[in-house]
Amino acid sequence: MTTIVSVRRNNQVVIAGDGQVSLGNTVMKGNARKVRRLYHNKVLAGFAGGTADAFTLFERFEAKLEMHQGHLMRAAVEMAKDWRSDKVLRKLEALLAVADAESSLIITGNGDVVQPENDLIAIGSGGAFAQSAATALLENTDLSALEIAEKSLTIAGDICVFTNQFKTIEELKY
């Protein structure tokens, strides 16, 4: 699987992800880009789960963003509706973490849209490790969102065998 973490602090939101692609117990690729910018670089998105499934979701989510003129919440809710009702989408195994200047959201494989507490998202196999590290850093340091995301992803990569140290980090300042 993978680890994706999103942190929001001081007019900055960051989504960071590792690059490991695993097939069973085998590492197939170590430098996959699981975080990207969408909708005129105004939305950040990261995925955890099956790579092919995630690319399908990225394409569909970007189409929803275009349809709803970049309105993140509306696009996420419409994506979730499709996810629940479409026979193909229902079989996709992936999670999306998405963020813009106003909101941070998780779109789940069940078609749920969750706005997390404290604007902190951590998903994937190393998500609990990254969330723990990011929470501690948010509560006890003055580090930037980018520094917290990077450090928490490093900690997750040190602990989780399905997370490596190759990082893709995208940042929005607003």
UniProtKB/Swiss-Prot annotation:
Gene3D superfamilies in UniProt: Glutamine Phosphoribosylpyrophosphate, subunit 1, domain 1
Keyword line: Allosteric enzyme, Cytoplasm, Hydrolase, Metal-binding, Protease, Sodium, Threonine protease
Entry-linked PANTHER family: ATP-DEPENDENT PROTEASE SUBUNIT HSLV, METALLOPROTEASE TLDD
Highest taxon listed in the record's lineage: Bacteria
Pfam entry (one): Proteasome
Top enzyme category: hydrolase
Reaction equations catalysed: ATP-dependent cleavage of peptide bonds with broad specificity
GO molecular function terms attached to this record: metal ion binding; threonine-type endopeptidase activity
Binding-site residues for Na(+), renumbered to this chain: 157, 160, 163
Similarity-based family: Belongs to the peptidase T1B family. HslV subfamily.
Physiological role: Protease subunit of a proteasome-like degradation complex believed to be a general protein degrading machinery.
UniProt activity-regulation remark: Allosterically activated by HslU binding.
Subunit: A double ring-shaped homohexamer of HslV is capped on each side by a ring-shaped HslU homohexamer. The assembly of the HslU/HslV complex is dependent on binding of ATP.
Protein's name according to its UniProt entry: ATP-dependent protease subunit HslV
UniProt key word GTP-binding: no
